[in-house]
């Protein structure tokens, strides 16, 4: 049973654990390393993409999240390159095994016209914040949810995933 605690700053070790999970998530997205992504995510995730594609999943199983992220219609498309740059952030511990992170984000995107990645078709960059959920699973902090908030975008962000 999860014990509720008043929101507080997490202990140093817990903060580092969440930073590791966040780094692994971002790097796995950008390198398209789906095995690496599988290792850093929780068994169930809360994915709130209402701000991006109008959808919310309160409890998405890890295998469905992996399938969505690696889909040809999303980040699995070899012609799409990204960099998920995480800026300043703060962490709040809401339960003994739950932490919420609030992070500045800039996500750069390029879509290429060919498989050899010789010609950039579109570029688009999103700027804003991500609310990230973390949960403790067998003593390891895992990426457990995401809610991006795009405050503004550059270039043709809306065309990247067409």
UniProtKB/Swiss-Prot annotation:
Record-annotated active site: 84, 109
InterPro entries: NTF2-like_dom_sf (IPR032710), Scytalone_dehydratase (IPR004235), Scytalone_dh (IPR049884)
UniProt keyword annotations, A-Z: Lyase
Pathway: Secondary metabolite biosynthesis
GO biological process entries: melanin metabolic process
Top-rank EC class of the record's enzyme: lyase
Record-listed E.C. numbers: 4.2.1.-
Keyword Lyase: yes
Domain of life: Eukaryota
Keyword Lyase: yes
UniProt: substrate binding residues: 29, 49
MF terms in GO: scytalone dehydratase activity
Function: Scytalone dehydratase-like protein; part of the gene cluster that mediates the biosynthesis of the tetrahydroxanthone dimer neosartorin, which exhibits antibacterial activity. The two different monomeric units appear to be synthesized by the same set of enzymes, among which the Baeyer-Villiger monooxygenase nsrF is the key enzyme for the divergence of the biosynthetic routes. The pathway begins with the synthesis of atrochrysone thioester by the polyketide synthase nsrB.
Family statement: Belongs to the scytalone dehydratase family.
Protein name (Swiss-Prot/TrEMBL): Scytalone dehydratase-like protein nsrI
Highest classification ranks of the organism: Eukaryota, Fungi, Dikarya, Ascomycota, Pezizomycotina
